[in-house]
A protein has these predicted regions:
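Hydrophobic anchor at the beta1->P-loop junction of P-loop NTPases
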Residues: 5
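ATP-binding Walker
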Residues: 11
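Conserved substrate/cofactor phosphate-moiety recognition/catalytic segment
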Residues: 22-64
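NTP-dependent small-molecule kinase module
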Residues: 23, 96, 143-183
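Glycine-rich phosphate-binding loop used to anchor ATP phosphates in small-molecule kinases
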Residues: 56-94, 100
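A glycine- and Lys/Arg-enriched "phosphate-lid" helix/loop adjacent to the NTP-binding pocket
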Residues: 94-144
Length: 183
């Protein structure tokens, strides 16, 4: 089985995905990390190279390669504007696609930054000083990516819950079971 986690930036796809994979005994893949490895680049360089369509095509290629890997997996998917690169997988019977959703305020609370070398860091003073700007940008992202996620039927509202609680709720809501071969 493949569990896709979709959602806007900073909604919690990677953290939730890692924890869910660990709980279920599945492999975990993060599209950002897979893109960095495959194209031998940083995210900073990747997002500043080529057009959005070209970047989404490259992401689609990495999705295809990752989907060919055997075994159960949880796969966190970076927001992609050109959804053709993942829509073909949504109808597969061994795929559970979930869009993680939350309010712009809750997403803001989880907001982290990264430098040009992709090192993640928190800067709550800066973040809070620019709160209105970031809330507006998060709302724009939610609005902009809604069409991309239209075919993802499972919408999971996180309600500001902790990652541990979100994983518990996902396991219960979708009746997920551990992979006995890996646990």
């Amino acid at each position: 089985m493949t569990i896709f986690l979709f959602g806007v930036s900073n909604v919690g796809k990677t953290t939730t995905g890692e924890m869910l994979a660990r709980k279920l005994g599945y492999d975990f893949y993060d599209l950002d990390e897979e893109v960095k490895k495959f194209y031998n680049t940083t995210l900073e360089d990747f997002v500043n190279t080529g057009s959005l369509e070209e970047r989404d095509w490259k992401r689609g290629r990495v999705i295809d390669m990752t989907m060919k890997k055997k075994g159960n997996k949880v796969f966190s998917i970076t927001p992609i504007a050109y959804s053709d690169h993942f829509n073909r997988y949504l109808a597969c019977e061994d795929v559970l696609a979930i869009e993680l959703q939350d309010s712009s305020e809750h997403i803001f609370d989880r907001l982290v930054f990264s430098d040009e070398n992709d090192h993640v860091y928190k800067d709550d003073d800066y973040k809070n000083a620019h709160r209105d700007y970031y809330i507006r940008e998060i709302k724009k992202d939610i609005w902009a990516y809604t069409p991309s996620f239209l075919k993802v039927k499972n919408k999971f509202y996180m309600d500001g819950d902790s990652p541990e609680r979100v994983v518990e709720r996902i396991v219960a809501e979708y009746g997920l079971k551990c992979d006995r071969k890996k646990t």
